[in-house]
Amino acid sequence: LSVMMVLGMCSVVGAEETSGSYGDNDGIITIQKAKKNQTYTIYRILKLESFSRGDKREEGNYAYTLEEGWDDFLTNSSEYPTGNYLQKDKDTGYVTWDSTKTDYAAFAKDALKYVKAKSIAPAKKAVTASEDGEVSFKDLPLGYYLIDSTAGALCSLDTTDKEVIIQEKNGVPSVDKVVKSGDDYKDNNTASIGDKVEFKTTITAQPGAQNYVLHDKMDAGLTFDDTSIKINLMKSGETTESPVGNTNYTVKIIDLESTNPCTFHIEFKQDFCDTLKANDQIIITYSATLNEKAEIGNTGNKNETKLTYGDNNKTETATTTTRTFEIPVFKYTLKDNKETALKDATFTLSKDSVTTPNTKEIIKLEKKNGTTTEEYLVNSSGTVTEITTGATGKFKIQGLDAGTYYLTETKQPDGYNKLTTPVTIIISDTGTITVKGTNVNPVKVENKSGSILPSTGGMGTTLFYIFGVILVIGSGVVLITKKRMK
């Protein structure tokens, strides 16, 4: 809740009239630039029993008496230090303002605190603005009024005319949220499981800020690092940030398994909020780790932020999305021109194209239970570095950042030729998989078998034997013929 004015009060007395009394129920207070869906409530502190004056209202005589229920406000200085700004005459009961007191904003806040503590009834029914524009309180008895707004914005009053106009000078706060993507901040990014994800939330404040509480909710795929929170303040018109001391706020970590929908809250102390000017920016940075519960694909992993302020008001929710992807692989061979699953092929996945096992960085994995497909999750502490295909020839590697990957066959099935070079796979920021310039899903890897070579003792050798025998026999016939001729 916030008091609707810098001075916090307004007197409704006659502007043109030179005299009047409390029974004149024709006072009007109009709030200009009222904010849509904000509620305005008016309380009367003093009755103006009568007045008389000349041309200048400040030179007139005014007889104020205390409204019922406000006596403790003037006397309980420990709870309401500015209550003694009003001086009540013991004999007559009339009230005057101590002219040496000028902290009107503090007085208004104490008066509002008293209203809540004592459940003081409003002077008129509260009004909620249906649109940005004006709201009015009409038919008001003459008196000294306090106006309260749920918007958390202060307005100034510098008139005691019978028809009083209040300017709603300030808007409501706003929240912007981004996530680090490379060297920039955007509303979305991509990451591998195990990567740190850095967030930045900016609250653009307004004067009269009250009850600022930042609420942050992370999906189950993000593990919040509660030591990572840093809060800075950048004053309006400036370009440098300064740290906000941790005495100015409290952080509450919420158990995600509970029914509370938030991951953490940051509640800003009112003393800090009181220092904020229009368009000052509170900049909060923090991080989380993408974990094994991460949603795979374009649905992504959400981080939502909103600010509650004033009396149960809240900003629009600001959201970022962190996506992580998968590479589905199908190992096959062609039999009768049909793709046939091939088992016992072994692969590694890396972020570099080096083929020497001792030098390239293999992505570590952990096995995940699948249905018809073997599934593996990225895990920097995982013990799986090679995947061997089963009877389906299929497997998936999940939890991958966008980027370029190299799938290397380290062992081929018996009787098949091993791939001589890695398969280059590119994952886009939207999860599209490209191989050799073509979008694919899954990544298909074919193995071929070579034709069989002739073996020793086969038909070819037999032919040599036959020809050899024929030659030997032929030689024998020649020798016999020659002997007979002799």
Task: Cite the ranges covered by each PLM segment.
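Solvent-exposed loop/turn and edge beta-strand elements of beta-rich ligand-binding domains
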Residues: 1-486
